[in-house]
Structures are given as C-alpha cells and as structure tokens.
C-alpha cells in the first residue's frame, strides 16, 4: 500500500522547486499532478509533467468558479504544445464539478480528468450521485 502520485501546487512553489520535486517524485516511482490556478503558472509545466490540474477554487477566498478551467484551457493547450513531451500530460479540471453537462463541456475544452469531492460530500447517497453522473456523461 502506498501512493501513486503527488500533488504539487504551483502557488506554493517556485518553478525550479516544482521541477526538482517532479524529478524526485519520478525517481520514487510517483506520478505528479501539477496544480495551477492561472495562466501565470503555466511556466511551471515541464516536459516531465504527468498531469496538469486547473483548480477552480480560489485558494485565497475558497470561492469556486468552474469558468476558470475554460478561461485557462486554450493557453494551457498552447503551453503544452510548445514543450517536447514524450507523452503530453493529462489535463484535469479540479473542483466545482457537479453536473454531467459540465463534464461534457470540459471534455470539449480538452480536459480528460475531473477531480470531484464536494459534490459527493454533500449528498446522502454518493454512490447514486456517481451513477447518475456517469450515466449523464
């Protein structure tokens, strides 16, 4: 039993720290989910980055705005296209996701992973909620 991945939050690190920690994580057999909140943090993406998550929750105010993923999506795809990846990173939209139509729209914008927590914490039956989401996609 152990971890498969680590979360590196760009807002808490310098680009060099992020790169060093990514290399160290890989040496330990871990994948890295790099979390960004704005286009100014796209410079934290390196060719070794496995996944890039766009957090839709403002870390200062804790307000969630799903539009953050859509605002960043095009610049994120451009930044990734400029890097010589062996395998391009998986794009993940994080927080504020609760409806199948939102997931469909995020998929159209290039996201393939979806981090959801609050939706399941607020329901009495997380299993049914997940089933409804899956069938709605």
State each model region's role.
Residues 72-75, 107, 122-137:
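C-terminal helical cap(s) of enzyme catalytic domains, especially alpha/beta-barrels
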Residues 25, 49, 76, 110, ...:
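Alpha-helix boundary/capping residues
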Residues 1, 34-48, 93-116, 128, ...:
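Catalytic cores of alpha/beta
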Residues 3-4, 28-30, 48-50, 87-89, ...:
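Short, well-ordered coil/turn segments that N-cap beta-strands
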């Amino acid at each position: 039993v152990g971890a498969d991945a680590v979360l590196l939050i760009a807002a808490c690190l310098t680009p060099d720290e992020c790169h060093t920690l990514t290399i160290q994580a890989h040496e330990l057999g871990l994948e890295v989910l790099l979390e960004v909140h704005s286009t100014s943090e796209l410079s934290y993406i390196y060719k070794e980055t496995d996944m890039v998550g766009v957090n839709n929750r403002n870390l200062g105010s804790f307000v969630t705005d799903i539009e953050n993923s859509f605002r960043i999506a095009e610049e994120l795809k451009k930044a990734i296209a400029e890097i010589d990846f062996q395998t391009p990173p998986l794009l993940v939209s994080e927080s504020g996701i609760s409806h199948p139509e939102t997931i469909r729209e995020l998929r159209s914008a290039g996201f393939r992973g979806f981090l959801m927590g609050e939706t399941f914490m607020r329901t009495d039956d997380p299993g049914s909620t997940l089933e409804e989401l899956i069938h709605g996609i």
